[in-house]
Amino acid sequence: SDFDAWVVNEQKNADTGLTEGSLAYEGQQVYLNAGCTQCHVIGGVWDVQGERIAPNLTHFANRNVFAGAALKNNSENLTKWLANPAELKPGTFMPNLELTEREIEALIEYLGTLK
């Protein structure tokens, strides 16, 4: 069934076959170096370095919503969220990481590969 296939996929690690120099690869580097790993995990890429208090992002691109189901998963909402999470969801634990526009663009491209 579709559900069984979904369960099998959700148990797999993220695809790590990114082309070095691609925007998605650049986004993975942002993920690894901007502080995301303090709270988030992506299976097969990097385990959480701090407390596992944030959502697992392994299959983020398959989700219809994010931010506690408050926002539709699209590039417009992700751009706003990554620029200033508290503006979209006051009281969120997600910090403003002061990412540049390029870093946000790359991170969104990377998150889009996580299926």
Per-segment meaning from a language model:
Residues 55, 73-77:
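A general alpha-helical scaffold signature found inside nucleotide-binding enzyme cores
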Residues 22, 33, 70-73, 94-101:
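Flexible gly/pro/ser-rich segments immediately N-terminal to CXXCH heme-c attachment motifs
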Residues 2-13, 76-115:
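C-terminal capping alpha-helices of c-type cytochrome domains
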Residues 15, 28-59, 63-68, 83-90, ...:
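Periplasmic/extracellular electron-transfer cofactor-ligation site
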Residues 18, 42-43, 72, 93, ...:
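Residue-level detector of alpha-helical recognition elements and their boundaries
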Residues 2-32:
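Electrostatic cytochrome c docking/interface patches
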